[in-house]
């Protein structure tokens, strides 16, 4: 199998000493005929090739940090005529013509829908570039394991948004959209998650759940990795444990078709002590629940804040998990909002439908808000907070 683009292309090149990569961007000097026929014949995708080149460069730099270096040394970003379709081959990425148009041009084409379509444009380049790792450098063993490609690519697009946006908003909105994609009911009263676990892959799609494959293998698969990153976050070293896991998984499986169990083996090598919710030194529970299972928890936190000595305050709270089996395990984080800056206070481990023991913490001052699951750290049906 081979991939290629054929046409009258303009080429732009850039050598990046930081990533040690040669980047090329190819775009046409005119839009496809179907756009010319709608009065947009003067648009020139090649004039916007720099934007695609910069997004690809930033993606390569970011993902080499998180996943490790690539062996290829070059990548070509190429425009193809479809408006909303991208695809990746080793060293060759197809991007839709829409990715080579600026916001004004997209507004001319789409009107008010341009704002919604902008989300796709923001995400398509990092998603497709990340397939240089997920799908090419590391393959997948069977259809059961394809979430290791598409889910990991969706996670990578989220990383890109977090790294390139000044505020956290787009990153949080990205995972909220994913949550709704997974859980919202269709016209038959069924959600994608009702179709089955991520592990079922292509078999998820039926007459009543036609888009379940896309919504689970891509969106929920990405969410699995997002949750794992949150579980492995360390207040002293940040994401370093998770980054070490991802480097290990890539190094161990380069040139191989990895399975879900291969990924679990890497997780078990790098798991934090507070992830040992079955007291067996393993994180099998996490993959069992989120890749092989379909349970979606709900959370409720009740808290109170009272004055303490020295101008400080005492935060007292309790968290309840519900809507799951008695064996379902998870940790959910609590955040504090001090003047718009979120601080992660810690996480609470829960098993089954239960209320965890009450926690009590002395704080230097009263927070503006106490937030549960602030960055969609856990895929939840709801995360409700009440208190003063």
Question: Positions of the model-derived regions?
Answer:
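Zinc-dependent metallopeptidase catalytic helix centered on the HExxH motif
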Residues: 57, 61-62, 112-180
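Beta-strand-rich binding/interaction modules
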Residues: 237-238, 279-280, 294-373
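Short acidic/polar inter-strand loop motif in beta-rich domains
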Residues: 374-387
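Surface-exposed patches in mature extracellular/periplasmic domains of secreted proteins
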Residues: 66-80, 140-145, 167-174, 237-245, ...
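Hydrophobic helix-coil surface modules that form long, contiguous segments used
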Residues: 1-126, 167
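Acidic/His/Gly-enriched intrinsically disordered linker/tail segments
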Residues: 119, 150, 154-227, 253-254
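Amphipathic alpha-helical substructures
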Residues: 214-313, 317
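Active-site rim elements
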Residues: 42-50, 141-143, 208-215, 249-254, ...
